């Protein structure tokens, strides 16, 4: 089996992606009124980075970005949700493997595929895994954390569905379409 190294491009993408994730997570959020639950723009950006650079970059961007955001905001990380940010980044990257954004195409079919995938991924991560980890790690009350999880899942589905789709479409549109250049 051939060993695959992580490219410099991927490492740089993780670093820049994590930094942007922190900035968006700290300064571009809309409070919902429910404790520790906001409309997050950072996950739409995470979907873009993950779709472009793949599951590993998504995993690391989500983990590092969320951990730094928590440390700079609260003084410590809420590890159950940090882990889920990594998982969701990996899932966005896995979904992105089928999109082929570098071809310059992000069709209606691709948008539907992306959005069905991100809806399923967000429900699994935020409505199921994060609250369960909150109970196992922090002994949090189930009704509180599952309510937070469901609200977060719905808000992330909306944010990624709108902002993420726009970002992916804009990125694909900036790529040179295959076969668009002809020799004269």
Swiss-Prot record:
The chain crosses the membrane at residues 11-31, 44-64, 77-97, 111-131, 148-168. It comes from the Bacteria. GO terms for cellular component: plasma membrane. It is a multi-pass membrane protein. The keyword Cell membrane applies. InterPro entries: ECF_substrate-spec-like, UPF0397. Keywords: Cell membrane, Membrane, Transmembrane, Transmembrane helix. The keyword Flavoprotein does not apply. It is found in: Cell membrane. Belongs to the UPF0397 family. This is UPF0397 protein SAS2570. It comes from Staphylococcus aureus (strain MSSA476). The lineage of its organism: Bacteria, Bacillati, Bacillota, Bacilli, Bacillales.
């Amino acid at each position: 089996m051939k060993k695959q190294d992580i490219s410099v491009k991927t490492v740089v993408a993780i670093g820049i992606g994590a930094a942007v994730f922190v900035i968006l997570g700290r300064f571009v959020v809309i409070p919902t009124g429910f404790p520790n639950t906001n409309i997050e723009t950072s996950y739409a950006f995470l979907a873009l980075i993950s779709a472009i650079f793949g599951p590993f970059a998504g995993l690391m961007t989500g983990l590092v970005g969320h951990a730094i955001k928590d440390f700079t905001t609260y003084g410590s990380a809420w590890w159950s949700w940090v882990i889920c940010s990594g998982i969701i980044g990996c899932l966005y990257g896995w979904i992105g493997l089928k999109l082929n954004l570098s071809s310059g195409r992000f069709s209606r079919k691709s948008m539907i595929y992306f959005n069905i995938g991100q809806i399923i991924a967000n429900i699994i991560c935020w409505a199921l895994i994060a609250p369960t980890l909150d109970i196992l790690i922090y002994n949090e009350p189930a009704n509180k954390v599952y309510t937070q999880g469901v609200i977060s899942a719905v808000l992330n589905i909306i944010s990624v569905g709108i902002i993420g789709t726009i970002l992916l479409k804009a990125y694909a549109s900036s790529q040179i379409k295959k076969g668009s250049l002809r020799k004269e």
